[in-house]
Design a protein with these regions (language model features):
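Residues at the starts of beta-strands that form the adenosine-phosphate
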Residues: 1-2, 34, 109, 141
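N-terminal beta1-alpha1 ligand-phosphate binding loop
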Residues: 1-29
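Short histidine/acidic/glycine/proline-rich micro-motifs that form metal-
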Residues: 11-12, 116-122, 150-153
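Short, well-ordered alpha-helices that flank and scaffold nucleotide-derived cofactor binding pockets
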Residues: 19, 23-27, 133, 137, ...
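A short beta-strand-loop structural module common to alpha/beta enzyme folds
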Residues: 28-44
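Helix-loop-strand module that forms the ligand-binding subsite of alpha/beta enzymes
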Residues: 40-138
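Glycine-rich phosphate/pyrophosphate-binding loop and the adjoining helix
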Residues: 136-205
Length: 205
């Protein structure tokens, strides 16, 4: 079996989470050879290959997935003096939003995750909800509810979140190894109100 983790990361938090999920998947599938972790910029159709599970994640910006203007904001934030934030190696590449648009139709099982500030999702938003919605529209089958991993107000990963991401990866592996059809889930909760982001800070990860 093959699991592919695709991520977008600005300050490295989502990258760390993606790697931890990949590690958990590898432990659950009993082989790291069964797991590939890729930044969005490297995740073409050929790289997805014959994946049995697709895991997609990105930072929450202005209640949803990043846009060019929010990635530009993150870049400017990292350049500020006396700032310990460092842009991820692939931060300048395309975001998950654009990647999903170009992905096309598929039937692969999937799970989605995001990084965001703590707080009610209706106020903070969750990129993972929108990622899941896009993938379902493309025909992919959701096997786990969207998951959030939290960052501090200084845009660093909260303590314990890396380990939690690894455990989530193990749970995804368990789902993949069992009868996936019985684990298919639907996310029928009301979607949060769309927000233009004015007066709010994005949650880059």
């Amino acid at each position: 079996m093959l699991a592919v983790v695709v991520y977008e990361s600005m300050f490295g938090n989502t990258h760390v989470v993606a790697d931890a999920i990949g590690k958990g998947l590898g432990e659950g599938l009993e082989s790291v050879d069964n797991v590939v972790v890729l930044p969005v910029v490297e995740a073409g159709r050929a790289q997805l290959g014959d994946a049995d599970l697709l895991v997609v994640g990105g930072p929450t910006h202005f209640h949803g997935m990043s846009r060019p203007r929010t990635r530009k904001w993150a870049n400017a934030t990292a350049q500020k003096p006396k700032n310990d934030l460092v842009l991820d190696h692939d931060a300048q590449g395309p975001g998950v939003r654009d990647w999903l648009t170009s992905l096309g139709h598929g039937h692969t099982k999937f799970a989605a995750f995001d990084t965001r500030f703590k707080g009610p999702a209706v106020l903070r938003g969750r990129a993972s909800r929108l990622i899941s919605r896009k993938l379902r529209r493309h025909g992919f089958e959701m096997v786990a509810k969207p998951e959030s991993f939290f960052v501090t107000l200084q845009n660093h990963l909260e303590p314990g979140e890396e380990a939690r991401a690894q455990e989530w990866g193990k749970r995804l592996a368990s789902i993949l190894l069992s009868d996936g059809v019985t684990h298919a889930v639907r996310d029928n909760r009301p979607h949060p109100r769309r927000c233009d982001g004015r007066g709010d800070d994005p949650d880059p990860g």
